[in-house]
Amino acid sequence: MASFFLYSLGLVFLSALTLVPLGLADKSPSHNMPPNPIYTTPIHKNPTNTPVYNPPIYKPPPTYKPPIKKQPINKSPNKKPLLLKPPLPKPPHKEPPSRKRPINTPPDKKPPLLKPPFPKPPQKKPPSRKRPINTPPNKKPPLPKPPVNKPPHKKPSNKRPPPYGNQPPPSIHF
């Protein structure tokens, strides 16, 4: 009985000696799993190494494509399948006919003929005025006044007049 106990203890000891140098004894299954990409961030951005949620990258939905028009399926075997009609060609563009009568003229009435230009009469000069402006016609204009006899014009002399006129200078008494 004691030998069996010693034998099992020896096996455990030997297994521990072989597993420790290989580096497999201290590893748990949680260390062997790959890191979760959602909760991993660089250390320089998260120095405390707390779990940070990185949302997944948004992908837009695929673009909408309209369904392709298919020819209608003919279920009756006797009838021919209905074909889609091609679009009709456009008629060629025609210019409108030119108007033979003026606009807003009834059709039974003929438009008036253009009259030839008459020669203009020669221009006459207006008659000259016989009386002054702003004078009533029954009143005669005043006659010009005769010139007044004026004395002949004298030239100014350059001589200085005497300081006291024609009187003698006053006597000064000391």
UniProtKB/Swiss-Prot annotation:
In which residue ranges is the amino acid composition biased (Pro residues)? Answer: 53-65, 134-150, 159-174
Keywords in alphabetical order, please: Cell wall, Nodulation, Secreted, Signal
This protein's source sits in the domain of life called Eukaryota
What is the induction note for this entry? Induced during preinfection and infection stages of nodulation in root and nodule tissues. Induced during root colonization by endomycorrhizal fungi in inner cortical cells containing recently formed arbuscules. Induced by Nod factors. Induced during actinorhizal root nodulation following symbiotic association with the nitrogen-fixing actinomycete Frankia spp.
Instruction: List the InterPro entries.
Output: Proline-rich_CW_protein
Return one Gene Ontology term, BP aspect: nodulation
Q: In which tissues is it expressed?
A: Expressed in cotyledons, leaf vasculature, stomatal guard cells and trichomes. In the embryo, expressed in embryo suspensors, the epidermis and underlying tissues of the cotyledons, hypocotyls, and radicle in maturing embryos, and the outer cell layer of the endosperm.
Query: What ranges does the record give for the region Disordered, renumbered to this chain?
Result: 28-174
Cellular component GO terms, alphabetically? extracellular region
Basic residues bias spans: 122-132
Instruction: Tell me, in a sentence or two, what this protein's role is.
Output: Involved in the infection process during the plant-rhizobium interaction. Involved in actinorhizal root nodulation. Involved in symbiotic association with the nitrogen-fixing actinomycete Frankia spp.
Family (UniProt): Belongs to the plant proline-rich protein superfamily.
Q: What is this protein called?
A: Early nodulin-11
